[in-house]
From Swiss-Prot:
GO cellular component term, pick one: cytoplasm
InterPro entries reported for this sequence: Ribosomal_bL36, Ribosomal_bL36_sp
Record gene name: rpmJ
GO terms, biological process: translation
One matching Pfam family: Ribosomal_L36
Protein name: Large ribosomal subunit protein bL36
Keywords (A to Z) from UniProt: Ribonucleoprotein, Ribosomal protein
HAMAP family named in the record: Ribosomal_bL36 (MF_00251)
Highest taxon of the lineage: Bacteria
Family (UniProt): Belongs to the bacterial ribosomal protein bL36 family.
UniProt GO MF annotations: structural constituent of ribosome
Amino acid sequence: MRVSASVKKICRNCKIIRRKGVVRVICTDQRHKQRQG
């Protein structure tokens, strides 16, 4: 899980979603998981 100020899609499988006001990236590649913090 990477925590960054700006989350970006890395590949075409990445999806940007909002959970409880937190912007997250979920992907089939576990290394692409990010959240905004």
